[in-house]
Amino acid sequence: MDFEKEIKNLAKEKIRSSAGGMPSETEADGRREIKEVMKIFLDITGLGIGIYNQGLANGRLSIYELTEELLTLFLNLHGKRLGFCLVAEGKFVVFLDEEQNQMVVLGKKRQSFGAGENVLTKARQLIRITFEKSDEGYVFKDNTGSRLDPEEIVLHIIKWAISV
Protein backbone atom coordinates (compact mmCIF):
# COMPACT_ATOMS: atom_id res chain seq x y z
CA MET A 1 0.00 0.00 0.00
CA ASP A 2 1.24 3.48 -0.90
CA PHE A 3 0.01 5.50 2.10
CA GLU A 4 0.66 8.94 0.59
CA LYS A 5 -1.06 8.03 -2.69
CA GLU A 6 -4.12 6.65 -0.86
CA ILE A 7 -4.47 9.81 1.24
CA LYS A 8 -4.16 12.03 -1.85
CA ASN A 9 -6.86 9.97 -3.58
CA LEU A 10 -9.15 10.49 -0.58
CA ALA A 11 -8.61 14.25 -0.85
CA LYS A 12 -9.30 14.25 -4.60
CA GLU A 13 -12.51 12.28 -4.08
CA LYS A 14 -13.63 14.72 -1.38
CA ILE A 15 -13.06 17.65 -3.75
CA ARG A 16 -15.06 15.95 -6.51
CA SER A 17 -17.96 15.14 -4.19
CA SER A 18 -18.22 18.66 -2.74
CA ALA A 19 -17.66 20.67 -5.94
CA GLY A 20 -21.41 21.18 -6.51
CA GLY A 21 -22.00 23.42 -3.48
CA MET A 22 -19.84 26.41 -4.35
CA PRO A 23 -20.73 29.60 -2.42
CA SER A 24 -21.95 32.72 -4.21
CA GLU A 25 -19.57 35.64 -4.64
CA THR A 26 -21.35 37.57 -1.86
CA GLU A 27 -21.09 34.60 0.51
CA ALA A 28 -17.41 34.18 -0.38
CA ASP A 29 -16.75 37.88 0.36
CA GLY A 30 -18.55 37.57 3.70
CA ARG A 31 -16.50 34.49 4.60
CA ARG A 32 -13.29 36.28 3.64
CA GLU A 33 -14.20 39.26 5.83
CA ILE A 34 -15.10 37.18 8.89
CA LYS A 35 -11.84 35.24 8.48
CA GLU A 36 -9.93 38.54 8.42
CA VAL A 37 -11.79 39.83 11.49
CA MET A 38 -11.27 36.57 13.40
CA LYS A 39 -7.56 36.73 12.54
CA ILE A 40 -7.38 40.30 13.89
CA PHE A 41 -8.95 39.25 17.19
CA LEU A 42 -6.99 35.98 17.35
CA ASP A 43 -3.71 37.87 16.90
CA ILE A 44 -4.57 40.57 19.46
CA THR A 45 -5.79 37.96 21.97
CA GLY A 46 -2.66 35.87 21.41
CA LEU A 47 -0.49 38.94 21.98
CA GLY A 48 -2.40 39.82 25.15
CA ILE A 49 -2.13 36.29 26.50
CA GLY A 50 1.59 36.21 25.73
CA ILE A 51 2.15 39.47 27.61
CA TYR A 52 0.03 38.28 30.55
CA ASN A 53 1.78 34.92 30.76
CA GLN A 54 5.24 36.55 30.65
CA GLY A 55 4.36 38.37 33.86
CA LEU A 56 3.66 35.08 35.66
CA ALA A 57 6.01 32.30 36.73
CA ASN A 58 3.58 29.81 35.19
CA GLY A 59 1.41 31.01 32.31
CA ARG A 60 -2.23 30.42 33.11
CA LEU A 61 -3.95 31.58 29.93
CA SER A 62 -4.02 29.76 26.61
CA ILE A 63 -5.63 30.26 23.23
CA TYR A 64 -6.84 27.73 20.68
CA GLU A 65 -8.20 28.16 17.18
CA LEU A 66 -11.43 26.20 16.75
CA THR A 67 -11.99 24.46 13.45
CA GLU A 68 -15.32 24.32 11.69
CA GLU A 69 -15.44 20.57 12.34
CA LEU A 70 -14.88 21.01 16.07
CA LEU A 71 -17.59 23.64 16.28
CA THR A 72 -20.00 21.37 14.43
CA LEU A 73 -19.19 18.02 16.01
CA PHE A 74 -18.41 18.87 19.62
CA LEU A 75 -20.09 22.21 20.23
CA ASN A 76 -23.11 21.41 18.05
CA LEU A 77 -22.86 24.70 16.14
CA HIS A 78 -23.90 24.10 12.55
CA GLY A 79 -23.06 25.94 9.37
CA LYS A 80 -19.79 27.43 8.24
CA ARG A 81 -18.50 28.67 11.58
CA LEU A 82 -15.20 30.16 12.70
CA GLY A 83 -13.88 30.77 16.14
CA PHE A 84 -11.23 30.55 18.78
CA CYS A 85 -11.20 30.20 22.52
CA LEU A 86 -9.32 31.57 25.47
CA VAL A 87 -8.93 29.21 28.41
CA ALA A 88 -8.19 30.48 31.90
CA GLU A 89 -8.20 28.79 35.27
CA GLY A 90 -11.91 28.16 35.83
CA LYS A 91 -13.12 30.17 32.83
CA PHE A 92 -13.63 29.60 29.12
CA VAL A 93 -14.21 32.33 26.53
CA VAL A 94 -15.12 31.64 22.91
CA PHE A 95 -15.14 34.10 20.01
CA LEU A 96 -17.57 32.97 17.27
CA ASP A 97 -18.82 34.34 13.99
CA GLU A 98 -22.51 35.05 14.14
CA GLU A 99 -24.70 36.49 11.41
CA GLN A 100 -23.02 38.23 8.51
CA ASN A 101 -20.75 41.03 9.77
CA GLN A 102 -21.17 39.98 13.41
CA MET A 103 -19.23 38.06 15.98
CA VAL A 104 -20.20 37.12 19.49
CA VAL A 105 -18.04 36.51 22.54
CA LEU A 106 -19.40 34.00 25.05
CA GLY A 107 -18.06 33.10 28.46
CA LYS A 108 -18.48 30.22 30.87
CA LYS A 109 -17.08 29.81 34.33
CA ARG A 110 -16.69 26.92 36.70
CA GLN A 111 -18.95 26.80 39.73
CA SER A 112 -17.93 24.77 42.72
CA PHE A 113 -20.65 22.94 44.60
CA GLY A 114 -18.36 21.56 47.28
CA ALA A 115 -17.14 17.98 47.63
CA GLY A 116 -14.93 18.49 44.57
CA GLU A 117 -17.90 18.87 42.23
CA ASN A 118 -17.35 21.51 39.53
CA VAL A 119 -19.87 22.46 36.85
CA LEU A 120 -19.62 25.06 34.10
CA THR A 121 -22.29 27.75 34.11
CA LYS A 122 -24.44 28.34 31.07
CA ALA A 123 -22.68 30.37 28.40
CA ARG A 124 -23.33 34.06 28.75
CA GLN A 125 -22.83 36.67 26.10
CA LEU A 126 -19.97 38.98 27.02
CA ILE A 127 -20.26 41.17 23.92
CA ARG A 128 -21.67 41.16 20.39
CA ILE A 129 -19.54 42.96 17.83
CA THR A 130 -20.61 44.17 14.40
CA PHE A 131 -18.04 45.14 11.83
CA GLU A 132 -17.84 46.76 8.44
CA LYS A 133 -14.97 47.22 6.08
CA SER A 134 -13.72 50.77 5.53
CA ASP A 135 -10.83 52.36 3.65
CA GLU A 136 -8.67 52.13 6.80
CA GLY A 137 -9.53 48.51 7.60
CA TYR A 138 -12.46 47.46 9.76
CA VAL A 139 -14.76 49.50 11.97
CA PHE A 140 -16.04 47.62 15.02
CA LYS A 141 -19.21 48.58 16.91
CA ASP A 142 -21.22 47.28 19.85
CA ASN A 143 -24.98 46.75 19.84
CA THR A 144 -25.59 50.46 20.56
CA GLY A 145 -23.57 51.53 17.52
CA SER A 146 -20.63 52.85 19.55
CA ARG A 147 -17.22 52.33 17.98
CA LEU A 148 -14.99 49.76 19.62
CA ASP A 149 -11.23 49.34 19.77
CA PRO A 150 -10.26 45.65 19.36
CA GLU A 151 -7.43 45.97 21.90
CA GLU A 152 -9.82 47.39 24.50
CA ILE A 153 -12.28 44.57 23.83
CA VAL A 154 -9.56 41.95 24.32
CA LEU A 155 -8.30 43.71 27.46
CA HIS A 156 -11.80 43.54 28.99
CA ILE A 157 -12.20 39.90 27.96
CA ILE A 158 -8.87 38.98 29.58
CA LYS A 159 -9.87 40.90 32.73
CA TRP A 160 -13.11 38.89 32.86
CA ALA A 161 -11.25 35.62 32.27
CA ILE A 162 -8.80 36.18 35.14
CA SER A 163 -11.28 37.68 37.60
CA VAL A 164 -12.33 35.62 40.58
Briefly describe each language-model feature range.
Residues 1-17:
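Acidic, low-complexity proline/glycine-rich segments
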Residues 12-67:
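Contiguous, amphipathic alpha-helical segments that mediate oligomerization or scaffolding
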Residues 5, 32, 151-152:
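Generic alpha-helical secondary structure signal
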Residues 68-164:
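Intrinsic disorder/low-complexity polar-acidic segments
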